[in-house]
Regions:
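Structural signature of Gram-negative outer-membrane beta-barrels, strongest in the C-terminal barrel
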Residues: 311-315, 426-429, 433-435, 441-443, ...
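Membrane-embedded beta-barrel scaffold of Gram-negative outer-membrane proteins
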Residues: 368-396, 542, 548-558, 575-636, ...
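Periplasmic N-terminal gating module of Gram-negative TonB-dependent outer-membrane receptors
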Residues: 39, 68-75, 104-115, 124-169, ...
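Outer-membrane beta-barrel domain signature, strongest for Gram-negative TonB-dependent receptors
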Residues: 271, 295, 299-436, 443-445, ...
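Outer membrane beta-barrel strand-and-loop segments of large Gram-negative receptors
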Residues: 404-428, 467-469, 473, 477-481, ...
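Outer-membrane beta-barrel translocator/receptor signature
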Residues: 186-188, 200, 209-215, 223-291, ...
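Conserved C-terminal beta-signal and adjacent last beta-strands/turns
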Residues: 267, 417-439, 584, 677-784
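Gram-negative outer-membrane beta-barrel transporters
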Residues: 427, 437, 487-494, 503, ...
């Protein structure tokens, strides 16, 4: 063990002086704790004293951003079961039992994890950001086996993820969503991966692996994230390459329904501040559903993903991160099960008689350049992405052989989206009186879609209609934004920001009807431009350490567009307007008992103007996107986290939502006063995870339960589209080696085997689509 007197003297000269100095730019990725502490010492100049056996095998969530060394060290050690003692300038790290706890020492062993987020385009602790959010660390994502956005929703109050088809998942935050599938039509919840916007939900439903954090930002984020975030944003940060150590990690999973999965990564330091990391995932699973007419499996999984990242120090203070990713997914479609004609009473079988199929590829490259200067930081993010998908599915929940009238629709839906985006922003240092972030943004999106629909007549299967819609929508968006914080007093901040966005869309549609050629039409070169200013104002008060309250007013907007699914030229030529949301919010973020208890809460009031909804116009009989007029959403959310011991984390959350259409009249139908679609009134969840030390290593485990209230999926409040309330429980338990190099885990999802509904359908017959059944298995993880 090193000489404590010598270390104490060094710390007195370095650490204490650094604490009083200007904040430092610190960048330490999530991973093993010992190399993280070594990087901390190099980046801060602080000398640390610890025993190797105390830190071996422990993991850290990392830290990134402009922080003082003391707070950065707290963040690195949070949740590790280690404590920090500062005595006479010395900085000593030890197990809880290794030394006494005094009133002047913070007990790091029972502190909750600190999650670093970029919600304000800076790296900050989630507790320091005056925005309602749920922030999930790398440790939480791994512990609770988060593999997709539906798993994220289990741990996030106010987030709903469901689907009618594989290519068109629905994502709602605080009830803000839409179910549009047309090309060039925007969603009100934005998904961002490493600050790159994913323009279509079908490209956002990918396998989640090798992540640093996920933050779900709630409410409009129009100032810093631009258009199409009226409901909020899901910000996904991948783990960056580590320039300090060679690392190999892997996990093998096997389970019921033929589940087999392998994922892993290799990290290679290249010297001179450069590193390369390659991570990959491959997953296969047999179908959990079956079409009893064709015998084909449905809801199976066949997914492969790979990501490569290179970090290069181009010059002192200049860093570049280059990324490339590729994903390929396929399955046999979803199990849309009839509960009327042809039904056999089993929700895991369908009566479609159609060879459903889903194929998708996504790929992208990006370059992130950061210049750290004395006058601030300049960041450039350039990205190119392409997604292509095709899906064959039955839109009616029963084969034509069971129908007594009408017809069975069979759809082939193909789309391809190519996007280039460029963001350039400046972040000032933390000046005495505040700081500012400002920047420019541009995106160019080209979207093409071929939508073919055949109608098979009842009983006979004769071709009743056959239409093909070839859609093309090109979108250009440019924006300029600024967001600044002014310190009005030592404990009071005022944040003011605004963004100006200009969207231009051009659209074309060629629609042909094989049996009724007289109805064919072609419309090209439709163009429209929409401009919007989205401001933000936040008043923040920090009356005590670990306590923050905020009052905010924000605006978001979802861009306008064209009804590319229109069945008449007149309907296509008529654009719909943008929707805007003004959000007024009062929030609290607090930490108690030396960060053993965390309590966050918010109440909000949202006012919609021109809300976009897909409804059937009773006067024309055409399914069209309309601006619904006005709507109001009131709600509240609360999240509680407690760490009663170094080996145990507990959490609970609750969300309340009351959203209604104030004015919404379409043709002869008045939807005013109806509840908003995809808006469960109540959501609640509890979770626990443990890492208990024993003689042979650690006992590890996690448990969670998430409950959602009943809600309707349509604006007309059709009782046939009402989904019942449900709750899901997940469990895992296992053992981990003393040094953390391996872990064996048994897990089960949907423990009670609940047949919960993702959606209902009323096309010709009533039908339903249920979520995954109970799944269970084993996983073996290794880290070297």
């Amino acid at each position: 063990m090193a000489n404590p007197t010598l270390i104490g003297a060094l710390c007195a000269l370095t650490f204490c002086g650094t604490l009083q100095a200007q904040t430092l730019t610190i960048d330490i990725p999530a991973g093993a704790l010992q190399p993280a502490l070594d990087q901390y010492a190099r980046q801060t100049g602080v000398q640390l004293l610890y025993r190797a056996e105390d830190v071996q095998g422990r993991q850290s969530d990392g830290v990134r951003g402009q922080l003082d060394p003391g707070r950065a060290l707290d963040a690195l050690l949070a949740g590790t079961g280690l404590a920090v003692r500062r005595d006479g300038g010395a900085v000593m790290i030890f197990r809880e039992a290794a030394g006494p706890s005094t009133a002047g020492n913070r007990d790091q062993g029972t502190e909750l994890n600190t999650v670093t987020v970029t919600a304000q385009k800076r790296s900050q602790s989630a507790q320091d950001v005056p925005i309602a959010m749920t922030a999930l660390s790398a440790r939480t994502l791994e512990t609770h086996r988060v593999q997709n956005l539906q798993d994220v929703a289990r741990l996030t109050p106010g987030l709903l993820v469901s689907a009618f088809s594989q290519a068109n998942p629905t994502i709602a935050i605080r009830g803000v969503s839409n179910t549009f599938s047309q090309i060039g039509v925007n969603k009100p919840v934005g998904v961002f991966v490493d600050d790159v916007f994913i323009p279509r939900n079908s490209a956002a439903s990918f396998e989640l692996f090798d992540l640093e954090s996920i933050a779900v930002l709630k409410g409009p984020q129009g100032t810093l994230f631009g258009r199409n975030v009226t409901g909020g944003a899901i910000v996904i940060n991948t783990r960056r390459p580590d320039t300090e150590r060679i690392a190999v990690e892997g996990e093998i999973i096997a389970g019921n329904h033929g589940e087999r999965q392998a994922k892993g990564l290799v990290n290679l330091p290249l010297g001179d501040g450069a590193a390369l990391k390659i991570s990959a995932s491959s997953r296969q699973r047999d179908g959990t559903g079956r079409d009893r007419l064709t015998g084909r499996e449905q809801d199976d999984i066949d997914s492969q993903n790979i990501r490569a990242q290179a970090l290069v120090r181009l010059a002192p203070g200049v860093e570049a991160t280059f990324s490339a990713d590729y994903g390929d997914d396929s399955n046999g479609g979803r199990t849309l099960s009839s509960d009327t004609l042809g039904a056999d009473g089993d929700v895991r079988t369908s009566e479609l008689g159609v060879n459903q199929d889903y194929q998708r590829t996504i790929k992208g490259i990006s370059a992130r350049l950061a210049w750290r200067l004395a006058a601030g930081e300049l960041t450039s993010i350039s990205a190119w992405r392409r997604s292509a998908s095709s899906e064959d599915y039955a839109g009616v929940g029963a084969s034509y052989t069971f129908l007594t009238s009408g017809s069975q629709s069979v759809t082939r839906d193909e789309d391809e989206i190519t996007t280039f985006s460029q963001e350039l922003r400046y972040a000032s240092p933390k000046w005495a009186h505040g700081n500012v972030v400002t920047g420019l943004y541009f995106s160019d999106e080209d979207g093409a879609r071929r939508l073919g629909v055949r109608a098979l007549a009842a009983r006979t299967g004769a071709l009743a209609s056959a239409t093909l819609a070839e859609q093309q929508v090109d979108s250009r968006s440019a924006g300029v934004f600024a967001d600044g914080i002014v310190h009005l007093a030592p404990v009071v901040d005022l944040t003011l920001g605004a963004r100006y966005t200009r969207d231009r869309k051009s659209a074309s549609l060629v629609r042909s009807d094989l049996l009724r050629p007289a109805s064919n039409f072609s419309v090209s070169a439709l163009r429209n431009t929409w401009n919007e200013v989205t401001p933000r104002a936040v008043l923040t008060w920090r009356p005590a350490a670990g306590l923050m309250t905020y009052l905010s007013a924000t605006r978001g907007f979802t861009s306008g567009g064209y009804n590319a699914d229109a069945s008449s030229a007149t309907a296509f030529r008529m654009p719909f307007d943008p929707e805007t949301v003004d959000n007024y919010e009062l929030g609290l973020k607090s930490q108690w008992l030396h960060n053993r208890v965390r309590l966050n809460a918010s109440v909000f009031h949202m006012k919609y103007r021109d809300k976009q909804e897909l409804v059937n116009n009773t006067q024309t009989g055409i399914l069209t996107i309309f601006n619904a007029g006005k709507a109001t959403v009131d709600g509240s959310e609360i999240e509680l986290a407690v760490k009663p011991a170094s080996w145990l984390d507990l959490s609970a959350n609750f969300a309340y939502l009351d959203g209604r259409y104030d004015r919404f009249v379409v043709g002869t139908v008045n939807n005013s006063g109806n509840p908003m679609s995809n808006s469960p009134r109540r959501q609640a969840g509890i979770a626990a995870d443990l890492r208990y030390p024993v003689s042979f290593g650690y006992l590890v485990g996690a448990a969670s339960y998430a409950w959602k209230d009943s809600y309707n999926t349509g604006a007309a409040n059709d009782p046939n589209l009402q989904l019942p309330a449900f709750g899901l429980a997940n469990l895992s338990a296992g053992v981990e080696s003393p040094d953390g190099t391996w872990r064996l885990l048994a897990w089960v999802k949907n423990t009670n085997d609940t047949a919960y509904l993702l959606t209902r359908s009323t096309q010709v017959v009533r039908a339903r689509y249920v979520g995954e059944p109970r799944t269970f298995g084993l996983s073996l993880t290794g880290r070297f």
